[in-house]
């Protein structure tokens, strides 16, 4: 979870949070070295080309949320590979499928991923609703920044919805394979 203030993002996470560590490394790579450090540093280890620092704490929150959803996609890919293997095994005639415990665990993981994504989708939708209620900024630059924040928020929301769609498709696919196996 996050508490978003004008200039501060307060993340709430477990102690061993890989997302926090990954994003901290990404931020460090995007930050150019101080002029005094430049001479002592290898020029290839500077800032990542094309990387931008977040414009605000809200932008940082959305980037971290996007990284989290990217990890959901990776988890979905791993589950998909394993479920495809089991599905092929289930559909092979005259074979005895014996991996029921692992299959049920994978289904449970899919359900949990679906629930987490639904919670995040609800939170992001509430965030978007709150953004719509913000007073319009006076300056064109601030207005552009607000518009970019809304666009990035919708992008992350769509990213979450893609994960949910894939998870539900996998659930349906494996349930169909189990039904065919027993018919």
Descriptions of predicted regions:
Residues 134-146:
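Short helix-coil transition/hinge motifs at the ends and kinks of transmembrane helices
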Residues 120-124, 142-145, 171-174:
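A glycine-rich, aromatic-flanked flexible loop/lid motif
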Residues 165-183:
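Membrane-interface, cytosolic juxtamembrane amphipathic helix immediately N-terminal to a transmembrane helix
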Residues 93-96, 149, 156, 174, ...:
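Alpha-helical heptad-repeat coiled-coil segments that mediate oligomerization/polymerization in large
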Residues 56, 146-147:
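General structural signal for secondary-structure boundaries
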Residues 1-136, 155, 159-164, 169:
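Peripheral, non-transmembrane regulatory/ligand-interaction domains of membrane transport proteins
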């Amino acid at each position: 979870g996050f508490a978003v203030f004008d200039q501060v993002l307060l993340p709430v996470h477990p102690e061993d949070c890989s997302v926090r560590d990954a994003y901290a490394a990404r931020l460090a790579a995007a930050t150019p070295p101080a002029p005094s450090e430049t001479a002592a540093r290898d020029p290839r280890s500077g800032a990542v080309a094309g990387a931008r620092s977040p414009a605000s704490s809200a932008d940082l929150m959305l980037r971290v949320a996007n990284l989290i959803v990217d990890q959901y996609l990776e988890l979905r890919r791993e589950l998909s590979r394993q479920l495809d293997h089991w599905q092929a095994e289930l559909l092979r005639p005259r074979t005895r499928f014996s991996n029921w415990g692992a299959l049920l665990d994978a289904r449970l993981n899919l359900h949990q991923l679906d629930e987490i994504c639904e919670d995040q989708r609800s939170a992001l939708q509430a965030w978007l609703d709150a953004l719509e209620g913000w007073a319009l900024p006076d300056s064109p630059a601030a207005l552009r920044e607000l518009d970019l924040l809304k666009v990035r928020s919708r992008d992350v929301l769509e990213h979450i919805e893609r994960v949910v769609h894939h998870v539900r498709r996998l659930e349906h696919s494996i349930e169909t394979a189990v039904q065919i196996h027993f018919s």
